[in-house]
């Protein structure tokens, strides 16, 4: 403790290790990460999930990290019940093996968390919720250790009740889905929720911040989000940073009816409003309002026991110049249905089938290819253009 020279040496070694990592663990020819090396120094060829931890530690540059995330979001890794440990196109892939292509709940939860951290919340939500059907296998409410990589069925060596599966499922929801981070020393709650756009009402109870206990209620519409807070203790500093629709305009915030400063940060697939307040009352509310913006709703996968993966896999999602761009891996022999929520008007979907369900809801259908004779996935890119609402002009 207190050894300044040792601290400097450690920092230098850390920088050296970080700078050399991407060179040693990236295959420039294949443009893919390297999972590890054999004793003879030869790089292992199979693409797995090891690169996810490297992204979390910022050991790859932005371009490399984006490449990894694009690959893992694809159908080669993703199933309707989670993320394969090895891509199904790799030589070592075996969907029935314990760790060579099977689907782990622990690994799937970690991958979902990585996508929330990397500002790809729609993909993160799509991956995380594939774990929900696990509770219907064997005893209701229990989660297996590992499932097969080709069909929705427990892997033969799987433990039927694995604590780390349940723990990872819940911890990734706390950290990623609701974005709860507590600093008890400063009595500060950082709340960065990524609520699915079709969740109108959500509650979280018994959030402890120092000596305080908070109950939270979220009410969400296409044009706003209201957070109701009950505080049964001393004042709490709240950093409220919820996800808002891509392209949202005129974002405003209020604390208990009084205007509050708000900032907006923009990532390609993830926009957030930032409000910092002190909660001094037993009951408070923070109201956010905006205009326009676009949100995407993907149908929940419903895997059948013993059946293969068939649902669409979202690989990209962005909104630029009043145009929504969606990248999907789909089975072209079946309909692919999406829902868009927006205040924008007159969507133009080109060859896609588009139906207005409500003033702010549209169903988009990618029709099947009638000549398709198999159930393999294909990548599709879709663009939907909008006209701004009158109020935003």
Model-derived segments and spans:
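Alpha-helix capping and helix-loop boundary segments enriched in small/acidic/polar residues
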Residues: 5-12, 41-45, 95-102, 157-164
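Extended, well-ordered alpha-helical scaffold segments
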Residues: 1-22, 61-75, 119-134, 185, ...
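Extended glycan-interaction surfaces of carbohydrate-active proteins
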Residues: 18-104, 136-151, 217
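Surface-exposed interaction regions enriched in Ser/Thr/Asp/Glu
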Residues: 281-300, 370-393
């Amino acid at each position: 403790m207190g050894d300044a020279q040792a601290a400097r040496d450690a920092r230098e070694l850390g920088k050296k290790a970080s700078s050399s990592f991407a060179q040693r663990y990236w295959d420039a020819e294949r443009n893919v990460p390297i999972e590890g090396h054999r004793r003879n120094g030869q790089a292992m060829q199979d693409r797995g999930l090891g690169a996810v931890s490297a992204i979390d530690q910022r050991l790859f540059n932005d371009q490399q990290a984006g490449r990894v995330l694009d690959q893992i979001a694809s159908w080669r890794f993703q199933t309707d019940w989670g993320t394969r440990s090895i891509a199904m196109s790799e030589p070592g892939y075996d969907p029935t093996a314990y760790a060579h292509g099977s689907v782990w709940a622990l690994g799937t939860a970690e991958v979902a968390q990585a996508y929330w951290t990397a500002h790809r919340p729609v993909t993160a939500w799509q991956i995380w919720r594939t774990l929900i059907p696990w509770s219907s296998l064997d005893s209701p409410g229990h989660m297996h250790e590992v499932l097969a990589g080709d069909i929705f069925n427990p892997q033969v060596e799987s433990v039927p009740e694995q604590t780390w599966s349940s723990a990872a499922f819940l911890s990734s929801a706390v950290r990623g889905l609701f974005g709860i981070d507590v600093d008890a020393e400063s009595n500060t709650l950082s709340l960065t929720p990524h609520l699915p756009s079709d969740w109108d009402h959500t509650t979280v109870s018994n959030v402890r911040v120092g000596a305080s206990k908070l109950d939270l209620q979220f009410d969400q519409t296409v044009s706003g989000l209201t957070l109701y807070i009950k505080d049964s203790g001393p004042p709490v500093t709240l950093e409220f940073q919820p996800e808002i629709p891509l392209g949202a305009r005129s974002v405003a915030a209020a604390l208990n009816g009084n205007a509050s400063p708000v900032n907006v940060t923009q990532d390609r697939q993830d926009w957030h409003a930032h409000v910092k307040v002190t909660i001094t009352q037993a009951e408070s509310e923070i109201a956010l309002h905006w205009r326009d913006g676009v949100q995407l709703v993907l149908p929940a996968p419903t895997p059948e026991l013993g059946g293969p993966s068939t649902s669409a896999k979202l690989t990209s999602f962005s909104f630029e110049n009043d145009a929504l761009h969606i990248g999907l891996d789909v089975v072209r022999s079946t309909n692919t249905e999406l829902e868009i929520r927006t205040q924008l008007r007159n969507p133009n979907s080109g060859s896609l089938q588009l139906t207005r369900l409500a003033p702010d809801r549209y169903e988009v259908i990618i029709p099947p290819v009638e000549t398709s004779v198999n159930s393999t996935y294909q990548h599709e890119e879709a663009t939907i253009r909008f006209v701004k609402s009158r109020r935003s002009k």
